[in-house]
Curated annotation (Swiss-Prot):
Its main location: Golgi. The keyword rRNA-binding does not apply. Its EC number is 2.3.1.-. It is an enzyme of class 2 (transferase). Transmembrane segments: none annotated. It comes from Schizosaccharomyces pombe (strain 972 / ATCC 24843) (Fission yeast). Belongs to the acetyltransferase family. This is Uncharacterized N-acetyltransferase C56E4.07.
Amino acid sequence: MVKTVNGEPLRHRPLQFNDIERVTEVSLLAFSDSATWKWRFKGMSSETMKALTMQLTRDAYFDPHVTCIVAYTDSNPYVGFLAFKKFPPDPNVSYRDWILKSLNKYYSNFLYWWYGAQIVQKRFHYNELQYGAALYKTGLLKNPKGFIHIHFVCVDPALQGNGVGGYLLDMAHDLADEYQIPCFLMASKMAFKMYEHLGYKTSVIANLVDEDTGELIRESPGMIREPKQPSSHET
């Protein structure tokens, strides 16, 4: 059955470089009320916030191990966005991909310097450490078959509630079911119920605390979806 949004078929395609700015705009709208995002960019201008969020999208685009998907309709080329990675990643990376990822890393460091946003870079690094510790506690890193890490999913706020998030996530879920491996993500408050509906269960809680002030920013649930078992006629 074809998924529709406002009567139009919902489709998807790989993220292209020229999509990065528009996808970033959707991301900023989708997470405008996120306490985590407000903390990450606290004290920064809207211009800086957009520039650095665009760089996050570039980071995903230039990572050869990350799958980036854009959902769209005939009238709206940017309905939603998904980025995920299969772990452990394929160790075979082309020289071209390695060079592009390395150059992007240098450019990322330049941007933080250019915008005087080293504190934002520090917060992101600290955030990654907290989420990484949460992932370690799940035991998934020791899973011999691996797992799929959902890095990012967002939907245009005007179109949320139409099943777009589930549509995007099903692409990762289908791959997980094929390999019979779990999916892991850190849930946003706004999408928590959707993740539960899709079969995710809370496995761990990461307490995101401001390293400088000691303020508790958010208790972030780390959630796991176990793969669906193949039906008898598929085995």
